[in-house]
Amino acid sequence: MFKTLAADFRIIFERDPAARNGLEVLLCYPGFQALVCHRVAHWLYQQRLPVIPRLLSHLSRLLTGVEIHPGARLGQGIFIDHGMGVVIGETAIVGDYCLIYQGVTLGGTGKQSGKRHPTLANNVVVGAGAKVLGNIQIGENVRIGAGSVVLRDVPSDCTVVGIPGRVIYRSGVRVDPLDHSQMPDSEARVIRMLLDRIEALEDQLEGLNLPPAEEAIDVTLAPVGDRCQLRDRTIEEFLDGAGI
């Protein structure tokens, strides 16, 4: 445990230029303080000691703003920068030398028992406010953008952004935003179906022979061609990330 804590301590000076000296890190870095408490709580948890590990985790959350379940397995050299609002669930696994920013959630989905939280390989960076949910695998050297919501496995050496998370770089090469072979966009497909249905209903409405009304009602519809162009443009903007 002490070797792991030493790696946690050293990595701060490598990754944070604001770290001036060891005393400052010990007293003013809540992320490191949370890791110290977690290392102790996790050891007690492994000894199957009741209540005390959870109590220590709870006190750590009150002190640092970081909530790490004592059952979570964290590698060495982890840096939780700023810390406030970080939540790491019971069955989460975090590899060596990962960087986690404030507001990150490594959470579960559903109420099932067993492995239900994500697994992060080595050297993963999770940006501020990102959510990684469910029993998914995040490969080595992955970068997850701030505010992203990741719900599926991510291969190594990728950059993921957006809601839901999409791979935009793979091994340093930008991925075509319209290529959904890796991460299909179900929301875009639903919107496409709805727009097609609206267009069909409008065509049916144009073909109706309505009886004359006492007062004229303006039911002028845009030409079909204009509606198709609007639909296609809207879909393309959505697929390219508009509104995310």
Swiss-Prot record:
Metabolic or biological pathway, per its Swiss-Prot or TrEMBL entry: Amino-acid biosynthesis; L-cysteine biosynthesis; L-cysteine from L-serine: step 1/2
Protein name: Serine acetyltransferase
Catalyzed reactions: L-serine + acetyl-CoA = O-acetyl-L-serine + CoA
Compartments in which it is found: Cytoplasm
Record-level GO cellular component terms: carboxysome; cytoplasm
InterPro entries, per database record: Hexapep, Hexapep_transf_CS, LbH_SAT, Ser_AcTrfase_N_sf, Ser_O-AcTrfase, Serine_acetyltransferase, Trimer_LpxA-like_sf
Gene3D superfamilies given in the database record: Hexapeptide repeat proteins, serine acetyltransferase, domain 1
Enzyme class (EC, first level): transferase
Family: Belongs to the transferase hexapeptide repeat family.
Keywords: Acyltransferase, Amino-acid biosynthesis, Cysteine biosynthesis, Cytoplasm, Repeat, Transferase
Entry GO MF terms: serine O-acetyltransferase activity; structural constituent of carboxysome shell
PROSITE patterns with a match to the protein in the record: HEXAPEP_TRANSFERASES (PS00101)
BP-aspect Gene Ontology terms: cysteine biosynthetic process from serine
E.C. no: 2.3.1.30
